């Protein structure tokens, strides 16, 4: 790597050191002085608050009307059972919610492995203890699983129909984040004669539903998507003034960011110079599937979002791009 004093270094690809199944160190170097703390702090915040995951949000237990009900044959209080359910690590392969059940005949230990799942749901920590049955008692419960990010108290998810909700439906405070712990350190790095560089070391532990490398990659995608708007000032400033004069439906001149696609789908499209909705609808399904890293799941997402706006792939537009719209994704 040749380095000059008047250019900002671009770090090499991350180095991954796996410490356990759920813990790893990610090393990024070399970085300009100060960039280690800048990137480390930003990634740590996003990793802890914004990585999506799944959690149990509602529980119904036969014979239990509220959190303070006493259940004969159950060693723990109902409150302790609910706390233990919050630590069940769940992975869903598709969809945003599911309802599962658990049935256990005592005496014995009830673990996460006793939760009945289907092909779409996977319990990662099956040995996690939920409660203990001390007598020949049956425990039956229904669990609602939902997708989210960060921490959401039960009160924040209360719906307008709260007054008429089913008696015995217990709502849980939910921690959706699959990231359990993140710490970072900045060490000294050297390239050739430069000794004033940073090395960023991120130590990350997850609950097993996502590996550390994928979590860091997702956090980087989120940061990249948020920062991308700062390179789009001209686009947004002029975007409202051009459509009426062009004779083109204003919707087609909106940036693909307005479709609120996932970060991965949006980045794949931009990498192929697809910046406007008008660019996108002229592409066919076959063409999009040839896009690197854009699979059938992303294609389905794109088709559904377009359909909500009365649009579809494979449409033909005359005189596209209209005057004032540049090919590189900026309004001219």
Swiss-Prot record:
Q: Which EC number(s) does UniProt give?
A: 2.7.7.6
Q: Which UniProt keywords apply?
A: DNA-directed RNA polymerase, Nucleotidyltransferase, Transcription, Transferase
What is one term from the GO cellular component aspect held by the record? Answer: DNA-directed RNA polymerase complex
- Region of interest called Alpha C-terminal domain (alpha-CTD), as start-end residue ranges on this chain: 248-332
Q: Where is this region: Alpha N-terminal domain (alpha-NTD)?
A: 1-234
Catalytic activity annotation = RNA(n) + a ribonucleoside 5'-triphosphate = RNA(n+1) + diphosphate
Name the SMART domains on file.
RPOLD (SM00662)
- Secretion signal, residue range per the UniProt entry: none
Which top EC class applies here?
transferase
GO MF entry, a single one: protein dimerization activity
Q: Which GO terms describe its biological process?
A: DNA-templated transcription
Its biological purpose: DNA-dependent RNA polymerase catalyzes the transcription of DNA into RNA using the four ribonucleoside triphosphates as substrates.
Q: How does it assemble?
A: Homodimer. The RNAP catalytic core consists of 2 alpha, 1 beta, 1 beta' and 1 omega subunit. When a sigma factor is associated with the core the holoenzyme is formed, which can initiate transcription.
What is the similarity comment for this entry? Belongs to the RNA polymerase alpha chain family.
- What does the domain comment read? The N-terminal domain is essential for RNAP assembly and basal transcription, whereas the C-terminal domain is involved in interaction with transcriptional regulators and with upstream promoter elements.
The name this protein carries in UniProt is DNA-directed RNA polymerase subunit alpha
Question: Organism source for this protein?
Answer: Xanthomonas oryzae pv. oryzae (strain PXO99A)
Gene encoding the protein: rpoA
């Amino acid at each position: 790597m040749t380095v000059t004093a008047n250019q900002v270094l671009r770090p090499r690809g991350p180095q991954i050191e796996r410490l356990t199944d759920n813990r790893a160190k990610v090393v990024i170097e070399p970085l300009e002085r100060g960039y280690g703390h800048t990137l480390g702090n930003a990634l740590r915040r996003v990793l802890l608050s914004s990585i999506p995951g799944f959690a149990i949000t509602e529980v119904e237990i036969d014979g239990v009307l509220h959190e303070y009900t006493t259940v004969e044959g159950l060693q723990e209080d109902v409150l302790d059972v609910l706390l233990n359910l919050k630590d069940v690590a769940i992975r869903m392969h598709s969809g945003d919610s599911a309802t599962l059940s658990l049935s256990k005949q005592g005496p014995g230990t009830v673990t996460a492995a006793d939760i009945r799942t289907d092909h779409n749901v996977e319990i990662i920590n099956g040995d996690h203890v939920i409660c203990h049955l001390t007598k020949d008692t049956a425990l039956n419960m229904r669990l609602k699983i939902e997708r989210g990010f960060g921490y959401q108290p039960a009160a924040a998810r209360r719906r307008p129909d709260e007054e008429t909700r089913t008696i015995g439906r217990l709502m849980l405070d939910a921690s959706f984040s699959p990231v359990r712990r993140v710490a970072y350190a900045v060490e000294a790095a050297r390239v050739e004669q430069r000794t004033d560089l940073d090395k960023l070391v991120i130590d990350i532990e997850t609950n097993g539903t996502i590996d550390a490398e994928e979590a860091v990659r997702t956090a980087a995608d989120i940061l990249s998507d948020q920062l991308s708007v700062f390179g789009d000032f001209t686009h947004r400033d002029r975007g409202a003034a051009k459509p009426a004069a062009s004779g083109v439906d204003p919707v087609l001149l909106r940036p693909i960011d307005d479709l609120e696609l996932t970060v991965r789908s949006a980045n794949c499209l931009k990498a192929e110079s697809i910046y406007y909705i008008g660019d996108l609808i002229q592409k066919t399904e076959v063409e999009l599937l040839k896009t690197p890293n854009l699979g059938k799941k992303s294609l389905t997402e794109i088709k559904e979002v377009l359909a909500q706006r009365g649009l579809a792939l494979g449409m033909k537009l005359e005189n596209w791009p209209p005057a004032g719209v540049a090919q590189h994704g900026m309004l001219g």
